[in-house]
Amino acid sequence: MKIRYAAKTDVGMKRTHNEDYFSLIEDEQLFLVADGMGGHASGEVASKMAAETIGEFYQRTREDEDATWPYKMDRSLSYIENRLVCGIKLANLRIFETSNRDLRYKGMGTTIVSCLISGDKIYVGHVGDSRVYRLRDNAIAQLTRDHSLLEDYKEAKPDMTEEEERNFPHKNVITRALGMRETVQVDIRSHQIKSGDVYILCSDGLSGMVVDDQIAQISTGAKSLERAVAELVDAANRNGGTDNITTLLLQCLAA
């Protein structure tokens, strides 16, 4: 599978610094977006630390196949899934320990969303409310479930209206993030890739400002992936830009 990609991050219209971070590990075809949180710029420390820790784990286990993993393998998951989950769990532990050891970073945390491509499959692992969408045949589908109070409430009340969603008082409160606790549950799923698929990784600075249909329209209508990520960021800023905005687009084509 041939992969093309483009990414863009932006501080937005209301924030003074950018706590989002994205990373590409091309040798592994692993792509990451993290949305940090915490006072005094510690959120940007957490998001970068998450991506770097995962990258370091992948490098170490690639160079030394006998390297000891910090967590036991889950027998219900494949080797590829276990490796991704382990990297994310290790990032969680490092952020948690740093937060507890250094008062400058107390309370810091981050979301993480990851896509790893192997053969004709894409593996999606995430914690928090950063998202992955798939564009296929001009239709958009969300492949992740937000770990948020709003999502929990929607599951308890499936007939919730769009207006009720917009006015939900705690819609930005997440229930899971890296660094909140010593251990973390990572959601991971695999999906079959179809040639022509586009996968969109993003922080909630995009998904909270631009509705899904508009994300699809911009992504399919742009002349290139580079134009698409720029136009998505512009749309989020036009709609208020209340948060940092990061988006990473992957296009999968038959080799």
Segments from the language model and where they lie:
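PP2C/PPM-type serine/threonine phosphatase catalytic domain
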Residues: 1-255
